[in-house]
């Protein structure tokens, strides 16, 4: 199915947010996620099912000062 990941159209096979994150290489990464502008905590990613056209945002923490 086609979804938008960080603003880029992406074809994915996974049905859940957790499966898509693993497919994209984010398994185990310390990241924040949102689907259609709604924050999705790590504990809810497996139960969060995606649909074609959904917008997924993946944000990794940045260090700096």
Residue ranges and their predicted role:
Residues 1-64:
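Ubiquitin-like/PB1-type beta-grasp interaction modules and other compact soluble beta-rich domains
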